[in-house]
Amino acid sequence: MLLYPRKTKFKNLFNRKRTKFLNNRIFSPNFKDFAIVSLEAGKLNNKQIELLRKTLRRLLKFQGKFWLNIYPNKNITKKSEGVRMGKGKGNVKFWYGSVSKGVVILEITGCSW
């Protein structure tokens, strides 16, 4: 089950500025066992997030819980190959969630390793 917003006001989102967003706060994990923290700003698409979720579910089984703190709410559009210029914006290629520096992406608790 790939994550993406089910209902949006517009099918294709507007372009955003290409600046890196830096947080002034240091984020700490809420659940205190293990956490994955981003070292740089970047993007995680919905396939990468789903792969992370499936792998953790398989490894943890019923021992522990995990929380994903990222959600893919922005999209990238692209026209198909061989299509001429114009005639509107292209179709949605994939959804992604932006990650800024120092943000907790994932938290794990209750595992024995």
Identify the role of each PLM range.
Residues 1-113:
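Ribosome-associated RNA-binding proteins
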